[in-house]
């Protein structure tokens, strides 16, 4: 999103919601030319919020990393998308860590899907590297159309990867990132959802965070519709493939 649109959204909502954690993700947020300015706007609106940057880590070595440490508390989740590229991500993280010498490293149990592999911590700052074996695909298909499943909302919600993460997108609040993205696409049909605007009943929306709603029926009820994250050919990286 353009920087001015992001600032407008923040200013519209800063007196309406008070997030403990504000996640910034994409796409790839490190591609945004004014990323650290966005950090500043978030902290100006919500001084006590923890900024969480979710990145694939490929561009960390090209960032002015010192600017990241000005916006604590800060977390950075580095998601590994290609096992054969993990050494590149590790190198970029190590370069980032060199800014300070007081990091504590914790190795986390590697069992399970969506686990955290390593965590680096220092006062006000945390980095973790994550691996996700599978992603549940949040739509069905009919020909070239993306259509919703007709699942039991409670069952679908029970396997959701982000069951309590609403999204602020284009100045509106959405239950989750997938529905915000799907409504933006030209080849979708059957998705019935109205996002919340600042003049709507925000309290009612907030009370349903982390709880199943009718829109959750758009996703499958089981991991049978999951995609192997590391399958050959699933993820391509420009200039590295």
Label every PLM stretch briefly.
Residues 1-158:
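Conserved glycine-rich "GG(E/T)P / GGGxP" loop and the immediately following alpha-helix
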């Amino acid at each position: 999103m353009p920087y001015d649109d992001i600032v407008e959204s923040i200013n519209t909502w800063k007196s309406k919601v008070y997030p403990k954690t504000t996640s910034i993700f994409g796409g790839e947020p490190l591609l945004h030319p004014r990323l650290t300015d966005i950090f500043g706007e978030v902290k100006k609106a919500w001084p006590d919020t923890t900024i969480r940057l979710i990145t694939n880590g490929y561009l960390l070595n090209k960032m002015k990393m010192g600017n990241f440490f000005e916006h604590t508390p800060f977390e950075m989740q580095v998601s590994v998308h290609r096992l054969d590229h993990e050494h590149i991500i590790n190198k970029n993280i190590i370069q980032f860590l060199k800014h300070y010498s007081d990091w504590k490293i914790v190795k986390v149990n590697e069992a399970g899907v969506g686990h955290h592999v390593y965590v680096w911590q220092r006062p006000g700052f945390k980095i973790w590297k994550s691996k996700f074996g599978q992603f549940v695909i949040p739509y069905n298909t009919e020909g070239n159309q993306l259509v919703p499943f007709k699942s039991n909302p409670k069952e679908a919600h029970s396997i959701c990867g982000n069951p309590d993460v609403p999204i602020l997108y284009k100045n509106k609040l959405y239950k989750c990132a997938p529905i915000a993205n799907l409504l933006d696409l030209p080849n979708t049909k059957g998705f019935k959802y109205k996002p919340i605007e600042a003049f709507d009943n925000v309290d009612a929306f907030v009370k349903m965070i982390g709880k199943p709603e009718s829109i959750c029926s758009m996703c499958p009820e089981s991991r049978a519709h999951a995609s192997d994250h590391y399958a050959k050919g699933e993820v391509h990286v420009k200039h590295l493939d």
